[in-house]
Design a protein with these regions (language model features):
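Residue-level signal for well-ordered alpha-helical positions
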Residues: 5-6, 111, 151
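Short, conserved loop/helix-junction motifs that constitute active-site signature segments
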Residues: 9-16
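Conserved AMP-binding/adenylate-forming
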Residues: 18-23, 27-46, 50-138, 143-147, ...
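Hydrophobic/anchoring residues in structured secondary elements
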Residues: 22, 175, 222-223
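AMP-binding/adenylate-forming catalytic core of the ANL superfamily
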Residues: 101, 106-107, 117, 129-216, ...
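Acidic/polar alpha-helix N-cap and adjacent early helical turns
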Residues: 242-253
Length: 253
């Protein structure tokens, strides 16, 4: 909304002296690039949970990135960031991010079983899948509950969303798994188009091919007028999945 409103302004307020801090679901790379190039605002991303009080990592542009192409700089800023002071980040064998720090909770109030599931050998299990690169930067691949399992392969909905959103005709996108007799789950893209723009399913799939492995490309794409969101604008994927999973036991993915 801010980016769209700024298009009608002759001068963007705070250009060159404003910082925008983003937390929650990782934003699309194209959005990060637009914030920095069109608004002139510094983009900072942080990651954490209520149980970690809340900061675990932070990603702020570094001086050595200043010479980079805006798209490459945005790609680096799309990572969740490096561990904050006093925080250690790790990974389980299954690829779930774990954290250890003084500010991590001791446990859930009067819920010993939930506490035992969440904290193992002193490490808090975040419920987020991810990676840690050679620089120590954390990248969130997906919430465990949002990972799509298609033909035995794990598909990150965030990765597919980023590929679809990079098409200029796409205004909003959500990617979910829906039941399929052959593959278990199919990758479904729900897309809201920019007003006045048009694009076909095949054109969007072709756009994704250089960016995604073949099994990650959405088998189906549906166009919507809007997507279910919370009051703060976060996608409600459980609501988007509901109608597709009626009559099936598994409704998480």
């Amino acid at each position: 909304m801010v980016l769209d409103a700024a298009a009608d302004l002759t001068e963007v307020p705070g250009a060159g002296r404003t910082r925008i801090v983003v937390a929650g679901a990782p934003p699309p790379t194209r959005t990060i690039e637009r914030v920095e190039t069109e608004l002139g605002w510094e983009f900072i991303q942080i990651y954490g949970l209520t149980e970690t009080a809340p900061l675990l990592t932070m990603n702020r542009g570094r001086a050595e990135w200043d010479h980079l192409d805006p798209s490459e700089r945005a790609r680096r800023l799309s990572r969740a960031g490096a561990p904050a002071l006093g925080v250690r980040m790790g990974l389980t064998v299954q690829g779930e991010l774990t954290a250890r720090a003084n500010q991590v909770m001791e446990g859930y109030w009067e819920q010993p079983e939930a506490t035992a599931d969440a904290i193992v050998d002193g490490w808090f299990r975040t419920g987020d899948g991810g990676t840690i690169d050679d620089e120590g930067y954390v990248t969130i691949s997906d919430r465990k509950k949002d990972v799509i399992i298609s033909g035995g392969e794990n598909v990150s909905s965030i990765e597919v969303e980023d590929a679809l959103f990079s098409h200029p005709a796409v205004a909003e996108v959500a990617v979910i798994g829906v039941p399929d007799e052959k593959w278990g789950e199919l990758v479904l893209g729900l897309v809201v188009l920019v007003e006045g723009e048009s694009v076909s399913e095949d054109e969007l799939r072709d756009h994704c091919r250089p960016k995604l492995a073949g099994y990650k490309i959405p088998k189906r794409i549906e166009f919507r007028a809007e997507l279910a969101r919370t009051a703060t604008g976060k996608l409600q994927k459980f609501k988007l999945r509901e109608s597709y999973w009626e009559g099936f036991d598994r409704k998480v993915n």
